Amino acid sequence: MDVDRFESDLCSYLNAHAAGEFRDPNRISDRWSTGRSIGHISLLLATLASGAHYSDLEYPERSEASQRLARRSFQTLRLANFLFRPSLDTIQALLILGNTIQNNGQSDAAWALLGTTVRLAQTLGLHTIKSITHWPECIQSRAKALW
């Protein structure tokens, strides 16, 4: 993973969020609906949502922080058009989000999300060694860890 690029993507997302670019759910700029960077942001937000669930905050604040970050991660997944263009980042974010919503007591939603995540992973060919052999070694190891 290119940490400098990830940091740049994160700063771009935070600046866009602060500027209100994501307030209108019916209008998504091309900058966020295309490209891989938003998948990285979704993964980061999902990780933060999971981490917030286990933080030292008192229960009401901890739950609210976790849910707020999970909502933002789902929003960035939508911006990444994850159903039509899945990636390793979006698959990983979905797995983390499924665990997070399971921990928040939404087991039915987590079960449905897991089924969707598995189908998206199969779309990428993560279930077969043959389909990932042409990928770079660092990506292959990530794909194997996800499946």
Question: Which residues does each predicted region cover?
Answer:
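Acidic/serine-rich, low-complexity amphipathic helices located in mid- to C-terminal regulatory regions
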Residues: M1, I101-W147
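C-terminal transcriptional activation/regulatory domains of eukaryotic transcription factors
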Residues: M1-D89, I96-Q106, T133-W135
